Regions:
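A short acidic, Gly/Pro-enriched loop at the edge of an enzyme's catalytic core
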Residues: 103-113
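A short glycine-rich, Lys/Arg-flanked "PGG" loop and its adjoining helix->strand segment in the class I
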Residues: 129-141
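Class I SAM-dependent methyltransferase SAM/SAH-binding core
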Residues: 57-101
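Conserved class I S-adenosyl-L-methionine
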Residues: 1-52, 57, 61, 144-173
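A C-terminal cap/extension of S-adenosyl-L-methionine-dependent methyltransferases
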Residues: 208-262
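Short alpha-helix
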Residues: 186-203, 209
Length: 262
């Protein structure tokens, strides 16, 4: 049986993660909405930790804005690109590390902690809770912590309408329709309430849960799909007006759970 590290590295070694947030409208929307929420809470000069920084899209952007950024990435190929993209830059440091073990950082070190990918790939409850607890631990009191996660329904809508519905249902749901999380699962999705319940009893105050890319990934392959460049900014603003509506959250692929450390 492959390890989590082997599964994740195998995927990202062949995926073009560096352009993911640029090459499609749903990626561009996800980036714009996530940055909107970051900017809602960040303050000039904040110390920011990004866990699961990928190739550095968010970390590098925030460092350019003058934030003191620490980027942690598990996959070596992603980390190599992050370091190449940030070479010679001020305000950014990068390390290889795992979201489930941040023992290299002291308690209450960062003003804002971003976990924008690791929870896509953690399937065992112990590891999920350890990653959440570690992110909260290293964040200062009253600091902001953001966790990206995937909707299991968004996964179904975006990936299993190509004659493979039965395979998707078996992959993601038990026979009585409970969401499945299991070893060797590359991407794990959640029911919205199920994800929010992970934080019960933890020293945080929930602020909001927001969708970051809506149904765009599910419809972008349509032959008639088009959002012209001149309309994109207005589209983002329109989406942001509804990004926290509970009745829409399940259909989005990517979501953001925003909380404050108590």
């Amino acid at each position: 049986m492959s390890t989590r590290m082997e599964i994740i590295s195998s995927f990202y070694n062949q995926a073009d993660e560096d352009s993911r947030l640029q090459r499609s409208r749903h990626g561009q929307l996800e980036y714009a909405v996530t940055m909107h929420y970051i900017h809602r809470f960040i303050k000039p000069g904040d110390k920011v930790l990004e866990i699961g920084a990928g190739t550095g899209r968010y970390s590098i952007a925030l460092a350019k804005e003058g934030m003191e950024v620490t980027a942690v990435e598990l996959v070596e190929s992603n980390l190599d690109i992050l370091r190449k993209n940030s070479r010679g830059m001020d305000h950014i440091r990068s390390y290889q590390g795992d979201a489930a073990d941040l023992s290299c950082f002291d308690d209450q070190t960062f003003d804002m902690t971003l976990v924008l990918g690791p929870l896509y790939h953690l399937y065992e409850a112990e590891d999920v809770h350890r990653a959440i607890d570690e992110a909260v631990r290293v964040t200062r009191k009253n600091g902001i912590v953001m966790f990206a996660f995937l909707s299991v329904f968004g996964i179904m809508y975006a990936n299993y309408f190509q004659g493979n519905w039965a395979a998707g249902q078996k992959e993601n749901f038990s026979e009585d329709y409970h969401v499945r999380h299991f070893k060797e699962q590359l991407f794990t999705g959640y029911d919205i309430r199920e994800f929010e319940q992970l934080f019960e009893g933890k020293p945080i105050q929930w602020i909001t849960t927001a969708g970051t890319d809506g149904i765009v990934e599910s419809i972008e392959d349509r032959l008639d799909f088009m959002i012209p460049d001149e309309d994109f900014s207005a589209f983002v603003n329109w989406y942001l007006a509804f990004s926290e509506k509970r009745e829409l959250l399940g259909s989005t692929n990517h979501l953001l759970y925003v909380c404050r450390k108590l």
